[in-house]
């Protein structure tokens, strides 16, 4: 019976994906540990450290899918050790050749390297889905390059912008996330096969070569020196997941706000039969957006646990190590849910362009006060213009009147304005700056990196 929300049948997919849960499942953990033991045996057989026929037998007979996890778990309770029962089970599968299982390595060598194998699987999923989200953002940014909407600062209406510009900001972030993932891959996907305290003493002179051969077989990079007490690789990966999750959480929160009834500029995908409330039949709640935004906080907390694991006692200890066992699966599973959720939202959300345009007019023209100020400033000076336009702006607020009318009535400003001139200045379409051009620039840059290519 599942005891963590991640694995609940009813709501588990709110917190992770089946694909990512499979990567961090107990069975896959065991499988990757067996993979390490096989690769080690083959490397040692090739180098003459153990008999070649024993290595071949281990490779052909060690089978994680045939191991009984429940029996191994019972032995773990008795032995008070996390790996020895697995080694014993593999030994039984291999007969006499089993004497050469786990030859020279320590538990952490196998567990850490197996964890990196799992992380490689997770890494590929994260890269794939991060790229897919970036592709959707690129598509939407171009589609809405000229879609006018209100830009808001401090929660209040500020200036006109375009929805495509907002999306391009997010796209640019995602390109940087892909660049980060690309950069850290070589540093993070590194195995560790060097004995009890990392000195290769149990392997003899062939130690570094055994490590290199083993890790090459596994498709992992070889460290310059053992990293049992240097956990920065996992911490760096966690840091990048934090950045990706942070952007996803921000997107979820922003779209959540734009979906508010009073703003009504977008709506997350809606399907027949979707229920918003058990008591209010009319509700079309932003459930997917809430889910997207909500996972950032727990991911941040789990990532912090990985950062804390960088503090290691002497050459190694299990206190920090075990925290990674908890947190690495969590950050990847949470992130997988966020990425898949974001994909569904971006692919299916509705954009209410009509309401976006209507919201530009909510303040009776005040959204263009900056435009008026700078135009008047060319004649009277910026500071004087700010003072005079401020007077009209506050009067528009307090009297609930049209900004244009107050400008035309102002004893000083009216001398420099005409109704036709104000109509041009107060048209939001004429004051989006370089927003459309920046959308194209971001898309060109994204395409130029090659990171969005299939």
Curated annotation (Swiss-Prot):
The keyword Lyase applies. CDD domains: pCLME. Keywords: Amino-acid biosynthesis, Cysteine biosynthesis, Lyase. Pfam families: ADSL_C, Lyase_1. Fumarate binds at residues 106-107, 233, 278, 283-285. GO terms for biological process: 'de novo' AMP biosynthetic process; cysteine biosynthetic process. Its EC number is 4.3.2.-. It comes from the Bacteria. GO terms for molecular function: (S)-2-(5-amino-1-(5-phospho-D-ribosyl)imidazole-4-carboxamido) succinate lyase (fumarate-forming) activity; N6-(1,2-dicarboxyethyl)AMP AMP-lyase (fumarate-forming) activity. Disulfide bonds: none annotated. The active site is at 154 (proton donor/acceptor), 277 (proton donor/acceptor). Transmembrane segments: none annotated. One of its GO terms (cellular component) is cytosol. Is able to complement a B.subtilis yxeK mutant in the ability to use 2SC as a sulfur source for growth. Catalyzes the cleavage of N-acetyl-S-(2-succino)cysteine into fumarate and N-acetylcysteine. Is involved in a S-(2-succino)cysteine (2SC) degradation pathway that allows the bacterium to recover cysteine from 2SC and to detoxify 2SC that may be a toxic metabolite. Can also perform the reverse reaction in vitro, and has minor activity against 2SC and other small molecule thiols. Belongs to the lyase 1 family. This is N-acetyl-S-(2-succino)cysteine lyase. The lineage of its organism: Bacteria, Pseudomonadati, Pseudomonadota, Gammaproteobacteria, Enterobacterales.
């Amino acid at each position: 019976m599942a005891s963590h929300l991640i694995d609940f049948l009813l709501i588990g997919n709110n917190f992770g994906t089946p694909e990512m849960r499979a990567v961090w499942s107990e069975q896959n953990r065991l499988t990757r540990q067996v993979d390490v033991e096989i690769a080690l045996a083959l490397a040692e057989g090739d180098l003459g450290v153990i008999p070649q026929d024993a290595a071949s037998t281990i490779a052909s007979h060690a089978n994680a899918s045939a191991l009984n996890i429940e029996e191994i778990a019972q032995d773990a309770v008795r032995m008070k050790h996390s790996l020895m029962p697995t080694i014993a089970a593999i030994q039984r599968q291999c007969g006499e050749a089993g004497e050469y299982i786990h030859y020279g390595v320590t538990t952490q060598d196998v567990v850490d390297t197996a964890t990196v194998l799992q992380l490689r699987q997770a890494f590929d999923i994260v890269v794939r889905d991060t790229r897919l989200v970036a592709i959707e953002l690129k598509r939407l940014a171009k589609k809405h390059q000229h879609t006018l909407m209100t830009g808001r600062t401090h929660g209040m209406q500020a200036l006109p912008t375009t929805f495509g510009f907002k999306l391009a900001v997010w796209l640019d972030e995602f390109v940087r996330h892909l660049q980060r993932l690309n950069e850290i891959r070589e540093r993070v996907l590194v195995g560790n096969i060097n004995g009890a305290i990392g000195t290769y003493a149990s392997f003899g002179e062939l130690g570094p070569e055994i490590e290199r051969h083993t890790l090459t077989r596994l498709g992992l990079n070889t460290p310059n020196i053992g990293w049992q007490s240097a956990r920065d690789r996992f911490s760096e990966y966690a840091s990048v997941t934090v950045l990706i999750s942070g952007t996803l959480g921000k997107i979820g929160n922003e779209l959540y706000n734009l979906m508010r009834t009073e703003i009504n500029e977008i709506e997350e995908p809606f399907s027949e039969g979707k229920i918003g409330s058990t008591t209010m039949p009319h509700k079309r709640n932003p459930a997917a957006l809430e889910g997207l935004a909500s996972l950032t906080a727990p991911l941040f907390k789990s990532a912090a646990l990985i950062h804390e694991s960088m503090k290691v006692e002497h050459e190694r200890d299990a206190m920090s190590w075990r925290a990674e066992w908890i947190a690495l699966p969590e950050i990847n599973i949470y992130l997988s849910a966020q990425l898949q959720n974001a994909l569904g939202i971006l692919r299916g959300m509705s954009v209410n362009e009509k309401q976006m345009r209507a919201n530009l007019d909510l303040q009776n023209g005040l959204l263009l006060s900056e435009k008026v100020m700078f135009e008047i400033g060319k004649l009277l000076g910026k500071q004087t213009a700010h003072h005079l336009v401020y007077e009209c702006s506050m009067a528009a607020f307090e009297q609930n009147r049209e900004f244009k009318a107050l400008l035309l009535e102002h004893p000083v400003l009216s001398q420099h304005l005409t109704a036709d001139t104000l109509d041009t200045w107060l048209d939001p379409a004429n004051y989006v700056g370089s927003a459309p051009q920046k959308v194209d620039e971001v898309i060109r840059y994204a395409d130029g990196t090659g990171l969005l290519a299939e």
